[in-house]
């Protein structure tokens, strides 16, 4: 009898438990278009983003896929979601959580240009409909996924309308108090995951699933910090310091250093940050970042001056390779200089990369894992010579720790360092079919194709590809606080001065935007002398760029060139000339930052008077008469001219030109022009119309 009663009770308990279990299952409705549906994915039932989200969430959740290919958010769009069968099914599902990803198809010219004013209204109405069937439901609005530049309508409106729709979604979230999740940023650096320019493949869908999973659960993988947070790190002194990272939602985070203790809580997107009070220069701080579950303590932390050193092979050129390199390396003992050396895993030399290398490069995993190191003969030997000499002169002058981050890549193009949004908006033509695009230097394209010869992917990624090094080498720095940037690049863009002129401005302004510092110092090296015909014009374009871009300075290197070698070995003067710009312009030291820089030329009685900046003590570098000046009445027909120093000005004349209209100096690919100032700093070559 007792056994029968026990069995009955167990049966009744089991019967009662089933509905309890069912009501505890959390229903997630994934509402959207073909991206939610899984168009283009071979096995969408297993690999669409909702299917992968189900795997991540587990049995406590029930995920429904209510994606409709071609659906628009707009009620007057060409295929309104609210008129589709999937919409009614989503309502009937009555999700506890509703993830909405709509808006991609609204970029169609049939939709956004005509009905943009209805977008916010229609989105709010859609949200209300889900709230009506489940008043307690949690609404997650997704920023729309990227559309790659390969899309046929990209430049005819799609790119601009895509941005406008993102802003409209933000407005909807503000009004409705819905949560915003970002389906755009995680996919944006990976256009190869969008084979048809719109639909993510399985891997792309996994990124969306992971994004939704973290937003739903608050699980962001625990405490994570930027790659630059290591022992021996250098923090920028004398300025409020942003220390940041990610952690699981609502996790308390405590940051401590030098008696400061700042506390915060990770937000719903897993992000946290604190602002430390300015720290004075020093070299033995301890930085602690803690959550209740995890702790990171960084030892031997310094506070001083932090500079990013970037560009191509002449910035990458190692200290041990330079003139007198062995002596310089043996003397490179300085714990006040710290190096963060970002080396590529594979050299961009004349070889075919293995398939595993190509796969890593496709995933932006080009750089080796590294950490901050004190400057020693061992750590400095393979470090950038230009950066080392720059940092050494700064440290000798400022007497504070100096941190140097170097991510230069040999042969890299200017466009590879420019952010994707800038190129999409202001120079989209350079993105198109980049390995066959003559905006990009033929040598760079040929070398990239050789490295990628074993690739089976239709879309190829490489450090010379537009945007690549920005995405692989700048974004991972996560806006680490810097004082400024030094740059040595241009050899791989000298074939097209006009394109570089546009690209360089995009690069400088884009990097300043990334660091939220419109006045960030940016000092760069003018190309040296070499027997390449286009370099005369290119050097002058660099000079003009310096005049147009504020807070920049240009180190002249033409006197240190090699007529046959693109990699001159005398790097010390170049690094020190960059340091002069920093010491004068950034740290306000009273030293000449540069050699004579052309200001203007005025015609007077068939003679030309040239004025310069930084013209103190003008003379010739070799004791001989000045050489390299030419005059012309008609552009293209120049004659050598005599030049005489008159105080801080130069008088130029020739009997062969009676009415001079144009002047140029040092106008040879490999120039022996010899004008310098009192500090033996060479004048930049130039060309201009005479006033």
Where do the PLM segments sit?
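Bacterial Sec-dependent N-terminal signal peptides
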Residues: 1-23
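Alpha-helical cap/lid subdomain in secreted, periplasmic
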Residues: 23, 55, 59, 78-222, ...
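Conserved SGNH/GDSL esterase-like catalytic core that processes O-acyl groups on lipids
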Residues: 24-30, 35-124, 279, 299-300, ...
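Short, solvent-exposed loop/edge segments of extracellular or virion-exposed proteins
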Residues: 224-232
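Surface beta-strand/loop "capping" patches
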Residues: 227, 236-240, 570-573, 580, ...
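Extended acidic/polar, glycine-enriched regions
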Residues: 244-327
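C-terminal beta-sandwich/jelly-roll accessory domains of carbohydrate-active enzymes
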Residues: 261, 609, 616-691
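Short, conserved helix/loop micro-motifs enriched in His/Cys and acidic residues
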Residues: 340, 347-382, 483-492
